[in-house]
Amino acid sequence: MKGSYKSRWVIVIVVVIAAIAAFWFWQGRNDSRSAAPGATKQAQQSPAGGRRGMRSGPLAPVQAATAVEQAVPRYLTGLGTIIAANTVTVRSRVDGQLMALHFQEGQQVKAGDLLAEIDPSQFKVALAQTQGQLAKDKATLANARRDLARYQQLAKTNLVSRQELDAQQALVSETEGTIKADEASVASAQLQLDWSRITAPVDGRVGLKQVDVGNQISSGDTTGIVVITQTHPIDLVFTLPESDIATVVQAQKAGKPLVVEAWDRTNSKKLSEGTLLSLDNQIDATTGTIKVKARFNNQDDALFPNQFVNARMLVDTEQNAVVIPTAALQMGNEGHFVWVLNSENKVSKHLVTPGIQDSQKVVIRAGISAGDRVVTDGIDRLTEGAKVEVVEAQSATTPEEKATSREYAKKGARS
C-alpha cells in the first residue's frame, strides 16, 4: 500500500511539471510569432523610410519679394546744423536808465517793433536846448539880412563905405553857417531821443532778456538787451564729400531748385523741406568736404538754431529702375549676389550690380529683371538648386518666437 501511495505522488508531480513546461513553451512560441511580423515590417520599412527622408526632408522656409520697376530718387546725404538766417544782438546806442521792456521772451517780433525804452528826459532837454539856439540864430540871421539890404541901398549913394558893406555881407554868411550847425545839433538831439526807444532791427524770435528794467545801460555794453534770431526763414549748413561736388554742380545747371530735406537725429522723421541756397567757395583740406547751405521757410517752427539734423538733397531721379529689398542683396567672394527663385521654388545664385540703395531698397542695374523673385529672409540656409518653401512674413511674431522658428528650421534643413 505504501509503495502504491508513493507512486501516485510521483505521477502527480511529473504531470504538474509537464503541464508547466508545456505552458511556458506555448507562451514563448506565441510571443516569437507576434514579434516576428513587426520586426519584419520595421526591417522592410526602415531602409525605404531612411532613403525617403534623405530624398525629401523638411523644406527650408524663406521669405521672398518680387523685383519691381519704378522711379528711384537719388539723394546725397550729410550731417548738418541749423543756423539762424540772421542773428542780431540788440544793444542800446545811448546811455541811460532802462525804463521798460516791451517784449516777451521767446516771442516773434517784426522789424521796427518797440523792444525797450530808456529814460528820455535828458534827451528831451538837449533837444529843447538845440531848438532854442536854432531859433535865436535864425532871428539874428533875419536881422543881419535886413541890415545888409539897407547897406546895399546906402552904398549906391556912397553913404556907407565898401568896407562896411563887405563886413555886413560876411556877418550874414557867418550867421547862415551858424544856422546850419544849429540844425545839425537839433537833428543829433532828435536822433538821441529816438534812440532812447529801442526797436527790432530784423524779423525774428527774441531770446532771453539780458538786462532788467531799472538798470543803467550804455552803448558800450557787449551783452546787449536781447538777442534776435531770424528763423523765418532759417538755414541749414551741412557737409558733402568733395567727390559729390560735380554731381551738385551738374544738377544746379539743370535750372531747377534742388530740394533739401532735414531729418531728425535718428533719421526716422522728416522735419522740413527746403531748397539749396549755395555751395561754399572752397573745400576743407582737412576733411575733404565742402559746406553746403540750404534755406527752409520754417513756418511751423520745426527747426531751431544749433539743432543737429541729417540732410538729404535730391539731385536726380532714376527712371524705370529695377528695385528689390535691401535685405535680399548679399556680398560674397565673387561680389554682390542675390538668390533668385524659379517657378518650382528652387533657388539659384545671381551675381548683380547694385546702384542707389538705402536701408529699405536697392536698385539693381544688372543681374536680374523686373518680375524676378528674390529671397529676403532665410538666406543662410540656401544652397545652389535647393528647393525651398516660401512663407509669409509674420510681423507680429515676438523675437523669442522668431529665434525658436529659425532654430527649428535649421534643424529641419540638416535632417
Swiss-Prot record:
Domain of life, source organism: Bacteria
Biased composition annotated in UniProt, kind: Basic and acidic residues: 399-415
GO cellular component: efflux pump complex; plasma membrane
Chief location of this protein within or outside the cell: membrane
Membrane association type: Peripheral membrane protein
Keywords from the named record: Cell inner membrane, Cell membrane, Membrane, Signal, Transport
Places the protein is found: Cell inner membrane
HAMAP family in alphabetical order: MdtA
Free-text function comment from the UniProt entry: The MdtABC tripartite complex confers resistance against novobiocin and deoxycholate.
Name assigned to this protein: Multidrug resistance protein MdtA
Source organism of the structure: Escherichia coli (strain 55989 / EAEC)
Lineage: Bacteria, Pseudomonadati, Pseudomonadota, Gammaproteobacteria, Enterobacterales
